[in-house]
Amino acid sequence: MEKIGRTKIVDLLKREDIGAMVNVKGWVRTRRGSKQVNFIALNDGSTINNVQIVVDLANFDEEMLKLITTGACISVNGVMVESVGSGQKVEVQAKEIEVLGTCDNTYPLQKKGHSMEFLREIAHLRPRTNTFGAVFRIRHNMAIAIHKFFHEKGFFYFHTPIITGSDCEGAGQMFQVTTMNLYDLKKDERGSISYDDDFFGKQASLTVSGQLEGELAATALGAIYTFGPTFRAENSNTPRHLAEFWMIEPEVAFNDIADNMDLAEEFIKYCVKWALDNCADDVKFLNDMFDKGLIERLQGVLKDDFVRLPYTDGIKILEDAVAKGHKFEFPVYWGVDLASEHERYLVEEHFKRPVILTDYPKEIKAFYMKQNEDGKTVRAMDVLFPKIGEIIGGSEREADYNKLMTRIEEMHIPMKDMWWYLDTRKFGTCPHSGFGLGFERLLLFVTGMSNIRDVIPFPRTPRNADF
């Protein structure tokens, strides 16, 4: 086979030099035709769109052609010509074909519809489908948008540890990391497990958040962001939870809660616009196939300012809805940690646009959030989105050493684990704020997928760590 430089299909479909000899490589989606001519739909993953390969059967070995089945990988040299059919401007008239990889007849991705549940069972193959090709190209583009946004605003990308000795959320739902023999655990004089001989000499876990370390960096570099995997051992089998997911966590010195809200709104609008501008074909495919209102919803986020609403006012709206006959599964009262149904009511039915809820009761928020003067609420914020509920959680951080100490004691967090964090309040403390965005929550919104397991390549959930 003549050596010709490969052209990606995404680039080929934009070319206008009709008559050029080209090489394309990819996987066969379908093959159809007559006794004289076959048409192969070829895809290489660079785009949702296939290129049609026109094969004059008289010019090729019959035994080789039998190997070209759905899923097979082939290389084609041919002439780029104007397409006589609808759907795309160009196609390739094959001159040479090489089968790079045959596909066994047990290949599960034949030309028919497959349920999302079935595709999760073959997560190693599902990126080859149109749906997951689109989702994972969008995932890549969202990652690019995140780095681009913060870089353009002068933030520094800061790497926080995956293995940690602290629990940022105070939730205790952490995966432990140990090299100890689990069948012969050493106990101390109180009967508790002794970690003296463990690798780190202390109890260690996979991180639930890089926020605390990010705060340290912000008090030195001014503005930083983290973007990496986080882990939570929540035994939650829901369409909204993963045990392993990715978080984006900016921290900014000298920002108050209002600045934090401005940054969150600007950031998420930037990401949504990036998807519409740079993933148009993939977004349109998902809109047409899964969620007819997807594009309209994405455009709506860009059009309207987010509502900024104190928690207390939000509770009043929900209580009024109940009084008028609206049924919620979970009760509504001041002090409750709002359920997804409450958040979505505010966004989808009352305001019909994203909402930033602020000034939550301190009892339902983390120790590091700055207290308001009323002594009952903290300067927290949650960004609520249609179909998703909470997509961002953040706050102005408590900068006062004594107030932070008191809050740590109230929540019974071991002081020995917090000395390094408290040092930043002793040595040149400053106002600062930040937030966390679950990357997969953002992807749920941008792709229109209904289950968070379908926006990450290999979901980690209770009883599931395959691949």
UniProtKB/Swiss-Prot annotation:
It catalyses: tRNA(Asn) + L-asparagine + ATP = L-asparaginyl-tRNA(Asn) + AMP + diphosphate + H(+). GO terms for cellular component: cytoplasm. Its EC number is 6.1.1.22. Keywords: Aminoacyl-tRNA synthetase, ATP-binding, Cytoplasm, Ligase, Nucleotide-binding, Protein biosynthesis. It comes from the Bacteria. Its main location: cytoplasm. Pfam families: tRNA-synt_2 (PF00152), tRNA_anti-codon (PF01336). GO terms for molecular function: asparagine-tRNA ligase activity; ATP binding; nucleic acid binding. One of its GO terms (biological process) is asparaginyl-tRNA aminoacylation. It is found in: Cytoplasm. Belongs to the class-II aminoacyl-tRNA synthetase family. PANTHER family: ASPARAGINE--TRNA LIGASE, MITOCHONDRIAL-RELATED, ASPARTYL/LYSYL-TRNA SYNTHETASE. Homodimer. NCBIfam families: asnS, PRK03932.1. This is Asparagine--tRNA ligase. The gene is asnS.
